Design a protein with these regions (language model features):
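N-terminal glycine-rich anion-binding loops that anchor highly charged ligand groups
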Residues: 24-27, 37-42, 217-220
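Short His/Asp/Glu-rich catalytic/ion-coordination signatures at enzyme active sites or charged loops
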Residues: 54, 75, 79, 235
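Alpha-helix capping and helix-loop boundary segments enriched in small/acidic/polar residues
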Residues: 17, 36-40, 58, 231-238
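Iron-sulfur cluster-binding electron-transfer modules in prokaryotic oxidoreductases
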Residues: 86-432
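Cysteine-centered iron-sulfur cluster-binding motifs in ferredoxin-type domains/subunits
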Residues: 13-32, 60, 64-84, 324, ...
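Non-heme iron-sulfur electron-transfer modules
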Residues: 1-8, 32-65, 83-113, 410-420
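Signature of N-terminal electron-transfer/Fe-S-associated modules in redox systems
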Residues: 17, 26, 35-36, 53-55, ...
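Short, intrinsically disordered, charge-biased short linear motifs at domain edges
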Residues: 4-16, 57-67, 179, 212-215, ...
Length: 432
């Protein structure tokens, strides 16, 4: 009996044939830079995909291993002169693995719970967050670390990346509308994410303050869902498509000039919802309209222009490019433009800022050793700048870099671009 078809578009011969094996992607690829193994380079992985997809070779343990080790950072797309859309190819390969490869019971159960039974349900995210918050604040975390039980279970490294759960969740802001300060320059709908609602509430609040301070009316649509990025990157395409449909139906009802996100990983997927649907599907045209209105908050503010007063910040700051902002959305200058607009800020470029920090969605949980290698290199470069603050544009990168600052004792603060803008704007407000 034939397996069911994979929903959505399928790569064709021409998509793979664009790769001419020139090798210009090699130095851009984090895993190739670490190991210098052809099979763990973009062109090496494409060669393996061709064997499976075009030559009908079986999916082997080796194939799965090399595809799993890819961060899907898409730096190879930036480097590629032939326009290979590697992200589409690797995510389809993962969808094939999801359908055809028998993972272990534990791996299959974990993936099924995370992608199909947790992320699509905000109330379950909140319930799990409350349990984690109890673990973090009751003293259990300190005890577990102190007696070595995490190390015994092989969880010590992964637990470093466990986000600090907020006291108040951002979900209570869903359904609210925030008026612009002064004349209204734009009306925007804010996409608040999923995990960010319980771990980055302050970032979401700062995003709203910065937008309203710069003349934007901000509506936070009620009952919005996870964007589906993590599911799409993992090859769980059915879950990603279901989430996309829900967000399309919700946000396309909003009368707004733009749909704003402060998460580069979410933004890349939101802009590319059409990649999840075939051209003949009704959702494809809806997804194209949705993507055309979606903007990263740094992209939107840089284009709109900052008009809020800002207090000088005497800080030396460096910026780590978020992969799905730089490589996925091709946005490099917008965050730098905003940082340079802050009075007295000393901005210094981070060496190799275009190389992934190792977060890559849940990569730091599934490929923890590799993630820590990339993080160690990133923190060495960050220390070389002598910056007091590392700035980035994605919550996942924030978690990774904050863990790096702790583990490597760099004594560097890690903030989102809008958090730094919010700090400067708050300092310029008259004291009541």
């Amino acid at each position: 009996m034939s397996p069911p078809p994979i929903s959505g578009p399928t790569p064709v011969y021409e998509d793979y044939a664009r790769c001419v094996h020139c090798g210009l992607c090699l130095n851009a690829c984090p895993t190739y830079r670490l190991w210098s193994l052809e099979a763990d380079s973009p062109r090496g992985r494409i060669h393996q995909m061709i064997q499976v997809e075009l030559h009908q070779q079986p999916i082997t343990d080796s194939f799965v291993e090399h595809i799993d080790k890819c961060l899907d950072c898409r730096a190879c797309e930036t480097a590629c002169p032939s326009g290979v859309e590697y992200g589409k190819l690797v995510e389809y390969a993962r969808a094939r693995i999801e359908r055809d490869y028998p993972r272990s019971w534990l791996a299959s159960t974990t993936r099924d719970f995370f992608f199909r039974h947790l992320l699509p349900y905000p109330h379950r995210i909140m319930d799990l967050a409350r349990v984690i918050r109890l673990y973090q604040r009751s003293g259990l975390q300190t005890i577990a670390r102190g007696i070595g039980v995490l190390k015994l279970l092989g969880l010590a490294d992964r637990e470093r990346f466990l986000p600090r759960i907020d006291e108040n969740f951002f979900y209570h802001r869903h359904g609210w509308t925030f008026p612009a300060n002064g004349p209204r320059r734009a009306r925007v709908a804010f996409f608040s994410g999923c995990i960010a609602n319980v771990t980055f509430s302050q970032l979401n609040e700062a995003t709203i303050r910065v937008l309203t301070a710069n003349g934007c009316e901000v509506v936070v649509p009620k009952e919005q869902f996870c964007c589906g990025a993590l599911a799409a990157h993992a090859g769980v395409r059915d879950a990603a498509r279901d989430l996309a449909r829900k967000n399309l139906a919700l946000f396309l009802r909003e009368d707004c000039d733009a749909i704003i996100t402060n998460a580069a990983g979410c933004g890349s997927t939101l802009k590319e919802y059409d990649h999840l649907f075939s051209p003949h599907e009704e959702e494809h045209s809806q997804a194209r309209a949705f993507g055309a209105k979606t903007r990263d908050v740094t992209e939107f503010l840089a284009a709109l222009g900052l008009n809020a007063k800002m207090k000088p910040l005497s800080l030396r700051v460096t910026y780590q490019d978020s992969c799905h902002l730089l490589h996925g959305q091709k946005i490099r200058e917008a965050p730098r433009t905003l940082l340079r607009a802050i009075p007295s800020l000393d901005f210094v470029e981070l060496p190799y800022s275009e190389i992934c920090c190792g977060s890559a969605g849940v990569y730091n949980l599934t490929q923890t050793g590799t993630s820590l290698e990339l993080l160690a290199e990133k923190m060495r470069h960050a220390q070389s700048t002598r910056a007091q603050t590392i700035v980035t544009a994605n919550p996942g990168c924030l978690l990774q870099l904050r863990a790096g600052a702790t583990v490597h004792h760099t004594n560097q603060e890690v903030l989102h671009v809008v958090e730094l803008l919010d700090r400067a704007i708050a300092g310029a407000r008259p004291q009541k």
